[in-house]
């Protein structure tokens, strides 16, 4: 996707798909091969909502921070809590030669990840879920997604 930001045009990745993966003995996650090029500039992993992890390409993280977090009012308690959630929980890393990233223990604990995970595209970032949690979330969403879409489309 191409977007305009101030004086500059930029290409924003659109991360799609669902991939079953397994963490190795050192808690490294292999990113799907077809998505790795989006993460060449670096990776930011942070706590996500609903018990998952958010995995941002460096450029998408910067855009997310500029659009969402930098605009928060530091005098608001809710804003400070949300900023802490993302910043304190974040970990910067690089892909290794095999396309892997290291997931820290606090991040693994947040997502209650054991070894089997699902990597799901979420437009400009990836979500990493414990495989069993992903199955539950998908089953819960299955019957209600049409109703949610209809409600959200109302003016």
Where are these regions (language model features)?
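Flexible "stalk/tail and boundary" regions
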Residues: 1-21, 25, 35-93, 97-98, ...
């Amino acid at each position: 996707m191409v977007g305009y930001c101030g004086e500059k045009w930029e290409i924003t990745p659109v991360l799609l798909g669902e991939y079953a993966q397994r963490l190795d003995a050192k808690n490294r996650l292999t990113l799907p091969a077809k998505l790795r090029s989006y993460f060449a500039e670096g990776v930011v992993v942070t706590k996500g909502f609903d018990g998952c992890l958010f995995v941002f390409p460096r450029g998408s993280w910067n855009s997310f921070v500029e659009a969402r977090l930098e605009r928060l009012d530091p005098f608001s308690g809710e804003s400070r809590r949300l900023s802490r959630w993302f910043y304190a929980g974040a970990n910067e890393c690089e892909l290794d030669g095999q396309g892997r990233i290291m997931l820290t223990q606090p991040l693994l604990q947040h997502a209650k990840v054991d070894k089997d995970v699902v990597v799901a595209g979420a437009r400009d970032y990836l979500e990493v879920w414990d495989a069993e949690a992903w199955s539950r979330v998908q089953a819960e969403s299955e019957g209600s997604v049409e109703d949610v879409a209809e409600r959200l489309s109302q003016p």
